[in-house]
Amino acid sequence: MREPMPSPENMEENKMEQYKKEFIEFMVESQVLKFGEFTLKSGRKSPFFMNAGAYVTGSQLKRLGEYYAKAIHDNYGLDFDVLFGPAYKGIPLSVVTAIAIHDLYGVEVRYCSNRKEAKDHGGDAGLLLGSKLKDGDRVVIIEDVTTSGKSIEETFPIIQAQGNVEIKGLMVSLNRMERGKGDKSALEEIQETYGFPANAIVTMEDVITYLYNRPCQGKIQIDDKMKAAIDAYYEE
């Protein structure tokens, strides 16, 4: 007897890297990614919500750094010098990911961040925290989630002001696949505007493909009703 043909969803899931599947489960397990009825800062209603501030324990941060490290390795390789994490949430992300890159791949990269206000005293005076940026540095920017390009609008000139620095790309944990100022997604607009690639560990499309009608943390996170709500959200 012939085996039944896999559904398109299962075919896409089978192509998904194992660490991406694990990261999706990790987000739900850590209560970083939730499904239900939420009101975003913009006032828009959303059937899902992500709060990267819910990563609070040592074990969670260790795993988070490892997922970022694997995604950066897959998308940009490890031929770069600095992880830049914009203040504030990007600061711990750049630190834990630099540690993970060393632990997983034996490669040393520096971390750097900006201060909201420049420090005017001491040996580390100035706008930057951690490593200084210097001519020739190759930088990967690391953030939690990008729903618009506002953060990069602030970060890009800070990095460029440090000298002849190459930005190899941006890595976020989840691409919400939200529209930017036009019809394209925020990450697509960043790529077009600034000329460097922008990627995510996973996209909402990955999340839907993997979690649809699949038990996770003792329940079906995305059933038919929730999937319909998410589809309607993206059609607005």
Where does each model-flagged region fall?
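A contiguous pocket-lining binding segment that forms or flanks enzyme active sites
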Residues: L128-V172
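Gly/Ser/Thr-rich loops at beta-strand to alpha-helix junctions
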Residues: A87-L93, S148
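Short, Lys/Arg-enriched N-terminal segments with co-localized hydrophobic residues
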Residues: M1-K15
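Active-site-facing substrate-recognition patch
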Residues: N14-L78
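PRPP-dependent phosphoribosyltransferase catalytic core
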Residues: K15-E25, P157, A161-E236
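Short glycine-rich phosphate-binding loop at a beta-alpha junction
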Residues: D79-A87
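Short helix-loop-beta connector
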Residues: Y76-F80, L133-G136
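Short, glycine/charge-rich flexible loops or terminal/linker lids adjacent to PRPP-binding catalytic cores
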Residues: V95-V139, E153, Q221
